[in-house]
């Protein structure tokens, strides 16, 4: 098993020999391999400019690698046209970003239910699942409230609930607690890790912070020659 591979069984995320360059002679990374199993959270750290966010965009099918392959739940992104990629993102991927992007004119329930509206017309079921996810992140009975009523940490909890409500195979997080104070960030990260594991998703989080990365099952460093396991 390579340093970037997780436990046995078919991974929910399988990346093989990935390479990406930027305009000019500079290569961000090459020979990148990564396997992430159900219920596993992997943190990828690295300095600014090494390609962490670019890697997430490739994993989400928003950007193309120069070489290699990405498969999500057994589906090779390279075999899909843009319409099929969009459908896969909506159905199988959840996103958590540093910016919360909670719409102020919608209730918290409606914000969390947004991914369901893209894949299912059943509004009653969507509301029920949104309320259940809000309960799961510690916002019991708050579905009828609005973003203005919440702290930064609570807003990120809403973002985590929204990322998980459609039961995705893969959760991608880009500096998910970068705007939070250290105590709030630690609580939100613990909640995020518990949610990923509890829902059986594969989680990939990129961060520059080793303290944030410590919550993960594996910590990998991204460099020009791929990923290196920080925990040996």
Predicted regions, residues:
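ABC-family P-loop ATPase nucleotide-binding domain
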Residues: 1-19, 229-232
């Amino acid at each position: 098993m390579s340093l970037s591979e997780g436990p046995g069984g078919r991974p929910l995320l399988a990346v093989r020999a990935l390479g990406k360059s930027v305009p000019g002679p500079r290569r961000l990374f090459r020979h990148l391999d990564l396997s992430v199993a159900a219920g596993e959270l992997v943190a990828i750290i690295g300095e600014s400019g090494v390609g962490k966010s670019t890697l997430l965009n490739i994993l989400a099918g928003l950007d193309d690698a120069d070489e290699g392959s990405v498969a999500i739940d057994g589906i090779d992104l390279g075999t899909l046209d843009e319409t099929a990629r969009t459908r896969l993102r909506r159905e199988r991927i959840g996103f958590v970003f540093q910016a919360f992007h909670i719409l102020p004119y919608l209730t918290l329930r409606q914000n969390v239910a947004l991914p369901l509206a893209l894949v299912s017309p059943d509004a009653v079921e969507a509301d029920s699942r949104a309320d259940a996810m809000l309960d799961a992140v510690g916002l019991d009975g708050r579905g009828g409230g609005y973003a203005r009523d919440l702290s930064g940490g609570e807003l990120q909890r809403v973002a985590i609930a929204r990322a998980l409500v459609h039961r995705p195979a893969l959760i991608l997080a880009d500096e998910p607690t970068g705007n939070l104070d250290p105590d709030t960030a630690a609580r939100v990260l613990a909640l995020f890790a518990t949610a990923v594991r509890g829902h059986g998703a594969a989680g990939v989080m990129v961060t520059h912070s080793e303290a944030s990365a410590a919550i993960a099952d594996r910590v990998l460093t991204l460099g020009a020659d791929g990923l290196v396991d920080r925990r040996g």
